[in-house]
Design a protein with these regions (language model features):
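Alpha-helical scaffold elements lining the catalytic groove of polysaccharide deacetylases
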Residues: 80, 129-156, 167-208, 221-224
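Active-site beta->alpha N-cap acidic-glycine motif
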Residues: 39-145, 149, 156-157
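Structural recognition of the beta-strand scaffold that forms the well-ordered cores
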Residues: 68-71, 95-99, 120-123, 159-162, ...
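Residues at alpha-helix termini
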Residues: 90, 116, 152, 174-178, ...
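Terminal accessory/targeting
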Residues: 1-69, 86-96, 208-264
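Solvent-exposed loop/turn segments at secondary-structure junctions
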Residues: 74-78, 102-105, 121, 127-130, ...
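Short low-complexity, flexible loop/linker segments enriched in glycine and/or proline
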Residues: 111-113, 137-139, 196-197, 254-259
Length: 264
């Protein structure tokens, strides 16, 4: 059974802010301070307990906070992933990384850094094979093997799964043992590694509750990610992990179920 990592009770956090704002609806506005030039610690309100309520508000048109999840597949690759982590740290942004098992060796410190800096870590199989049609034994060699490697590094096994290519079947749902995360925005950054095109496609498609798919193994994608963050910050978006996105919307993540977005 999927056991969620021990995060704060987001509903209670949001409810507390709602009371401070005098909100009576089930959805309460998320309060966040945004000092220029970039948002500092987007997810701080969602991750830090006991902090003072910040001063300014970022909401969508119906009063809900505009949340979006940035996710990266196929890492870790030391050169590009560490550069990405540096830039995300400068911007106070949390992301979700779906990792390849065979690339974990000699990158354990990179994975620990992800976890320590508040990012979410997930499974992207051992060597990026299609999971459809696999026997339980072969499926476990891809997913459970990677899960165990991550557990050895991080000390827990609360990981989401993203199947390569986003291809699904009933066998994956039966065997996953955890929630399955797809996406709602795919700029196909792997195709031509065109930074400008990727940025424009993501920014023009951005929507409250979206999950963005990118890859942290291309320098062009790393550059694009920074530009996307900076531009969407200007539009009032808050970047959170996948689990934070669903928890803030009071949407449960269940083992064997597939999720592509958390649209209001």
């Amino acid at each position: 059974m999927f056991r969620r990592k021990s995060y704060p009770d987001w509903a209670a956090v949001l409810a507390a802010f709602g009371l401070l704002l005098g909100a009576a609806a089930p959805w309460f506005a998320l309060v966040l301070s945004i000092p220029p030039p970039a948002v500092q610690a987007d997810a701080q309100v969602l991750t830090d307990e006991g902090g003072e309520p910040p001063s300014s508000q970022v909401r969508s048109g119906d009063g809900q906070p505009k949340l979006i999840a940035l996710t990266f597949d196929d890492g870790p690759r030391r050169s590009t992933t560490t550069a990405l982590l540096d830039g995300l740290a400068e911007r106070g942004v949390k992301a979700t990384f779906f990792l390849i098992g065979e690339q974990l060796e000699n990158n354990e410190d990179v994975v620990r850094r992800m976890d320590e800096e508040g990012h979410q870590v997930g499974i992207h199989t051992f060597d990026h094979v299609r999971l459809t049609g696999l026997s339980k034994v072969d499926f476990d060699a891809q997913v459970d093997r990677t899960r165990q490697l991550l557990k050895n590094i991080l000390g827990h096994n609360d990981f989401l799964l993203r199947p390569p290519y986003g291809i699904m079947d009933d066998g994956i749902r039966r065997h996953a043992g955890c929630p399955i995360i797809l996406w709602s925005i795919d700029p196909e950054d792997w195709k031509d590694q065109n930074t400008a095109r990727v940025v424009e496609q993501v920014v023009s498609s951005a929507r409250d509750g979206a999950i963005i798919l990118m890859h942290d193994i291309f320098p062009e994608s790393v550059d694009a990610a920074f530009q996307i963050v900076d531009r969407l910050h200007q539009q009032g978006y808050l970047f959170v992990t996948v689990e934070q996105l669903f928890a803030a919307r009071c949407l449960p993540l269940e083992a064997g179920q597939t999720y592509s977005d958390a649209y209001p």
